[in-house]
Amino acid sequence: MEAVSRVFPALAGQAPEEQGEIIKVKVKEEDHTWDQESALRRNLSYTRELSRQRFRQFCYQETPGPREALSQLRELCRQWLNPEIHTKEQILELLVLEQFLTILPEELQSWVREHNPESGEEVVTLLEDLERELDEPRQQVSQGTYGQEVSMEEMIPLDSAKESLGTQLQSMEDRMECESPEPHPLQDNGSFLWFSMMSQSMGGDNLSSLDTNEAEIEPENMREKFFRSLARLLENKSNNTKIFSKAKYCQLIKEVKEAKAKAKKESVDYRRLARFDVILVQGNEKLIEAVNGETDKIRYYLHSEDLFDILHNTHLSIGHGGRTRMEKELQAKYKNITKEVIMLYLTLCKPCQQKNSKLKKVLTSKSIKEVSSRCQVDLIDMQLNPDGEYRFILHYQDLCTKLTFLRSLKSKRPTEVAHALLDIFTIIGAPSVLQSDNGREFSSQVVSELSNIWPELKIVHGKSQTCQSQSSAEQTEDIRKRIFSWMQTNNSSHWTEFLWFIQMSQNQPYHRSMQQTPCESAFSSEAKLGLSHSQLTEELVASLHTENELDQADKELENTLRAQYEENIETGTDSSDIEENLSVTPKVAEKSPPESRLRFLSCVVCEKECTGVNSCISCDGNIHAICGVPSQHGTEGCGRQITCSLCYETSTMKRKHDEIQRSLPVKPSKMLKPSGTPFSPDKVGDWMAKQASLDFFVKKRHAFSEHSSSNKRNVNNRSYPEEGKTKRVHASFTRKYDPSYIEFGFVAVIDGEVLKPQCIICGDVLANEAMKPSKLKRHLYSKHKEISSQPKEFFERKSSELKSQPKQVFNVSHINISALRASYKVALPVAKSKTPYTIAETLVKDCIKEVCLEMLGESAAKKVAQVPLSNDTIARRIQELANDMEDQLIEQIKLAKYFSLQLDECRDIANMIILLVYVRFEHDDDIKEEFFFSASLPTNTTSSELYEAVKNYIVNKCGLEFKFCVGVCSDGAASMTGKHSEVVTQIKELAPECKTTHCFIHRESLAMKKISAELNSVLNDIVKIVNYIKSNSLNSRLFSLLCDNMEADHKQLLLHAEIRWLSRGKVLSRMFEIRNELLVFLQGKKPMWSQLFKDVNWTARLAYLSDIFSIFNDLNASMQGKNATYFSMADKVEGQKQKLEAWKNRISTDCYDMFHNLTTIINEVGNDLDIAHLRKVISEHLTNLLECFEFYFPSKEDPRIGNLWIQNPFLSSKDNLNLTVTLQDKLLKLATDEGLKISFENTASLPSFWIKAKNDYPELAEIALKLLLLFPSTYLCETGFSTLSVIKTKHRNSLNIHYPLRVALSSIQPRLDKLTSKKQAHLSH
């Protein structure tokens, strides 16, 4: 601990930005989720530390009284310790950790807090590791460049640590191979501790030995570290890991051999053989992936002891390639090498760490057409530090120009956010894409509000993207830190006063990707600070008050500059700065403000804030001391001279460029003499050829020149004005095959007219450029390592065997993938349209060919002809599509916890019993209904056979469990809902909590069937009349002609089906509408029936029946459809019951206004109608209907009783709840949550709301979702039967209905890429 304390005073209050190993593998370019997780952890740690400080620094004067002070302290303590997620032991550990950090020396406290320790043990480990590293003896190191040994004390003395840093980095630059055209400035670590720790982490080597092409990477040390890290990785994994120990590896080989030898195999043997196989390689048994016949590629399994050697050799063979290249090479040959193992190895590879620490992701500026086209909108939560009624900050940034706007908000309601955005849009214009890290729902609501306020505005919600220079989370946290810093400095809580200055500071930094600041990018000019940006002195500016005085001051300044310029001309002094000032025509020149007037200064290298004490001697830019290189030609007495790394790199590249130019052979003088004859316009090109050896320096110099911000940095541009636009000209030649290449396993083949190498082991044909020993050897060692040690005679024998065998086609010629995908895309609509399969070839294909031949030509028609669309092909495609949809459905159900079923059976055209089953489950923040499966029952439809069909599919095929089935809905048939052996009863034995529901629509139809004798006689008479006319074709034609002559609205009567009782409503309505036409027609045919239409009492009963049946038809239609819930159905039934009760009361007062047809008859006939008898008949019928509805829909079984909180949890009444006391308390808490209330009002469906509330209130949401998952009717099964009757007709009675039925009824989109990747395309037969 003392050694640690001795080092930390050197920090001088500066905390390093990075601790531990300074060189890490950068995976930001390949996997952004790592950065997001680390940013989230930093945000949580910062929030907890801030809460702790606020708790400790809380003052009694900040509150109006003692009760408020105590309440505020409790809230701050809760925010710090988080008792909701921490146990008592964890809270105690946090208190001990705080006290432990307090007793540490001040130098150690800041360093330890940077590591965000979670417990005291982590602090002890950090301090012990640091003490151990600082107490280790310094070893002697050898410098390969100078051939002499230098100790660590001699190489990095304490007095000149920073001075030696520049010299060592210069020597490192001389040895490094340039790998990127972009400059890589030194890291701003701000202390000698960083330099010391970096030296130790590199094992004591000199910094100049940082060579990315170094071959020695200490494999033995890497091996030991790799296996230790691998052991820790496997401890955190489950038993189902892909990495095998050697014992497990040998055991698997033994089990696979035993399984293959068994004559009668068990299920476990089949599963094992489906994954593994064993082959013999050079006398050793190897475990490989089972070959399924679709591919002949062999992929090996590795055990843990061979893992490091494979990774190490592959990494060296690809020249220290990154994770993507290693993954591509390894996974092509090995089955169980994962990304985690590859990344584990890469973190131990020193050259990769050194290389990636210098490489940066290239930042590219967006084109001008994307300005104000995409914006980032986020909300900064300031509820813990409100400024009056303002509790949030709107952070708006244009992702192209990086222009930032900040607005204070009172709430986070979408309406207020939209008004603040409109204020910004009226300044810079509205974007096309709006993205936000506050969630898709928030963005959608804001876009919707913007559209309501400004209808012409069209903005879409974009996918989340990070900014090029800094992520939105980091920017938000940076703004929050600036606000808290200002509040503490000024001892004020009114942060809205400083918000405008924060906005300006965000728009002032220089962005290297854009080569300018956000203000300059957006407005083509730097942000002005009045006359503070002028060339006038401060005293003169302070004395100016009018524009006339300003004009006079400008004239005097111009005269002064001109006099100085003329004086410099006479004396021969450099006057470039004065020339620039004289060439400025505006009255206020474009010049950077003095350092004394800048509110925020930034380093020109790292773009971070700096004090402005140090400046570059070349470009006069503000820099950190660590970001510069000490000048070697500084004069005595002038102090230490510093050059920024950008200028230093520019001068270094220029020096190397000049040295190489001087080393080139001298060309003849006539080639150097410029010609006086210009080229003709047709011979002038837009590029010129340069020597290949100079291209790097030309591009490097051009890249550095783009970062300059003054004319002094561009001093060399005049000599090479167009070098940045030059192109490298590669020599084009064909490599020849050498017979010695056979020892690498390659022979020569002719591909077209080019000679190419072909591997005799795997048959891969490489490019002609790969015909050289290094690349051929790389292929051999990376893909065929097991035979890499074989002698030359082995490969010659393999070559002879290959030539003696029939010619094998290794590389399959181009296959018509487009034709294969086209066949799938045609098969899908054929199945959706429920048409015969032959239509694809006989109609669709011929029509497409004719259209292509007419519009695109014969070549396009020939391509269409290649698409396979025969009858059998379409059948196979539909089967594959159905299987893929089924696999996706099963995966989605397994992801959801609960599901419910809807089942029914019917008889098809071939007298086969078809069982249809639908499923409802949670998916994508909503409840989804899908066709589950269909099954054919060849014999009886007993409950046992139905149950076995359901169980075999759900349990055996899908691997689901019935205990997660929360409900089963059927039509009430005996085989479904009998008292003893029904399907539902057997399912409830496996799932006791499963609820059974009888179809609401079916029960409503049953309730309508009870009718009085008088009304039933009217129905019978109507049926006879309809059958008399419709059964005789002559009567039907004569009646149609009569209706036409009488100009009736309808010309035909309608038939009804007895099984569909409510279909009589349309028959009765049609009969009532053309009653006069029927009276005329029946007078000559059936006079007895014509008397019925003359009887006003019979006609009144007909009118009533047509009215009441039409009303219940409407009710029946409203109960049909998808995504209906148990509660919506119960609401409609209860509403109809209350209507019947009200109608009954109105009838007693002779009010018939609710029956329109009956009211028409009463108004027509007047007193001829026996109104008393009619009142009795209707009242009796309405009473029977109420009794039937109460029988089929008992009030005591109303699902809403005790569950009304599910429909609206924010109701004031919380009585008669089917909840425990604990859940009732949670419901009361939910009802007062304003955020959820807003979400409830804006959510489209009730299930979506409860799914969103599941994170905060899981118990309540689970109860609600179980009831919302229940099917209220068998509507989906009925629509499925209709589809079944269309697909399987008497002409297609032998069709296997299951595959086309799934494709026609399912809403899941098939994965065509996956289907086509498993098949080999071929032309149509």
UniProtKB/Swiss-Prot annotation:
GO molecular function, one term: nucleic acid binding
Keyword Nucleus part of the UniProt annotation: yes
CDD domains: SCAN (cd07936)
Localization annotation: Nucleus
Coiled coil: 246-275, 542-568
Annotated Gene Ontology cellular component terms: cytoplasm; nucleus
Domain Integrase catalytic residues, every copy: 366-526
Listed InterPro entries: Integrase_cat-core, RNaseH-like_sf, RNaseH_sf, SCAN_dom, SCAN_sf
Expression by tissue: Weakly expressed in the lung (at protein level).
UniProt domain SCAN box: residue ranges: 52-134
Keywords: Coiled coil, Nucleus
Signal peptide start-end: none
Keyword Ubl conjugation: no
Superkingdom classification of source: Eukaryota
SUPFAM superfamilies, sorted: Retrovirus capsid dimerization domain-like (SSF47353), Ribonuclease H-like (SSF53098)
Other remarks on this protein: Highly expressed in non-small-cell lung carcinoma (NSCLC) tissue, with increased expression correlating with advanced disease, lymph node metastases and poor prognosis, as such may be a candidate prognostic marker. May act as an oncogene and promote tumor growth via positive regulation of cell cycle progression at G1/S phase transition. May promote invasion and metastasis via activation of the AKT/GSK-3 beta signaling pathway. Expressed in the cytoplasm in NSCLC tissue.
Alphabetized PANTHER family for the sequence: EPM2A-INTERACTING PROTEIN 1, LOW QUALITY PROTEIN: ZINC FINGER BED DOMAIN-CONTAINING PROTEIN 5-LIKE
Protein known as: SCAN domain-containing protein 3
